[in-house]
């Protein structure tokens, strides 16, 4: 340490030579005998440099997780109607409905026959053999059907013809509407028949009778041959 201090002192003294003489060069190299000074403190940080240029694109990263579901979009325009699909399977049966109101059934019918040969022409034929007359709309004492229910009726008759020709008419309220003529063939039993649809009002009467006298009164009946008269209501015309 004493030697180092002496050297520093000698260096600080002025030279006794000429003023223009250069100072002798300092020794070079680590082997010159000089010792390094104490390291100084670190300097202040410099100002940040400018942004560098963009680097080259990196490799494609891995697929990310799905994002959150976005809000519902606006309703789109109606599309074109598609083709008709196949027929579906039958549905399950529905519940049983409640009972409906009962409908009243209007009935009017009769079917009658002769018990013996007709002897009197030009009057209603009295059919007294009753097959059906539950409503009693046919009167066996007069031979006439009396309409109690307005509506459409069907009437028919089948006459056994024997011994004479037959001319029979169906009457409605004293007016002949239907005519049947059958000529008797000797020793043979024949049949004559007719049928008609009639609309009747309440109070109308319908019957059969022989017309044009005794020579056309071959209406016949016995225990094996019948002559019949039938009528019944097809549908009523009652406003409820």
UniProtKB/Swiss-Prot annotation:
GO terms for molecular function: hormone activity; identical protein binding; sialic acid binding; signaling receptor binding. GO terms for biological process: brown fat cell differentiation; cellular response to insulin stimulus; cellular response to xenobiotic stimulus; detection of oxidative stress; fatty acid beta-oxidation; fatty acid oxidation; glucose homeostasis; glucose metabolic process. The modification 4-hydroxyproline is found at residues 39, 42, 48, 86. It comes from Bos taurus (Bovine). The keyword Phosphoprotein does not apply. The record marks 225 as: Not glycosylated. SUPFAM superfamilies: TNF-like (SSF49842). The keyword Protease does not apply. The record marks 57, 66, 71, 90, 99 as: Not hydroxylated. The modification S-(2-succinyl)cysteine is found at residue 31. This is Adiponectin. The gene is ADIPOQ. Residues 103-240 form the C1q domain. Its main location: secreted.
């Amino acid at each position: 340490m004493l030697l180092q201090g002496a050297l520093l002192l000698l260096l600080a003294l002025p030279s006794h030579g000429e003023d223009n003489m250069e100072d002798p060069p300092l020794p070079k190299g680590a082997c010159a005998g000089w010792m390094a000074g104490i390291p100084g403190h670190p300097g202040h940080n410099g100002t940040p440099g400018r942004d560098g240029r963009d680097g080259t694109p990196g490799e494609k990263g891995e697929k990310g997780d799905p994002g959150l579901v976005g809000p519902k979009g606006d309703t789109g325009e109606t599309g074109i109607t598609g083709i008709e699909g196949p027929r579906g399977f039958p549905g399950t049966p529905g519940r049983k409905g409640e009972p409906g109101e009962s409908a009243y059934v209007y009935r009017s019918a009769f079917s009658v026959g002769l018990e013996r040969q007709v002897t009197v022409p030009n009057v209603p034929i009295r059919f007294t053999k009753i097959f059906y007359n539950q409503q009693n709309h046919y009167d066996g004492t007069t031979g006439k059907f009396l309409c109690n229910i307005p509506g459409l009726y069907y009437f028919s008759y089948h006459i056994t013809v024997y011994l004479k020709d037959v001319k029979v008419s169906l009457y409605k309220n004293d007016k002949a509407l239907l005519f049947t003529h059958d000529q008797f063939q000797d020793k043979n039993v024949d049949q004559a028949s007719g049928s008609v649809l009639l609309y009747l009002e309440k109070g109308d009467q319908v019957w059969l009778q022989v017309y044009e006298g005794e020579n056309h009164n071959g209406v016949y009946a016995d225990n094996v041959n019948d002559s019949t008269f039938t009528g019944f209501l097809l549908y009523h015309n009652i406003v409820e």
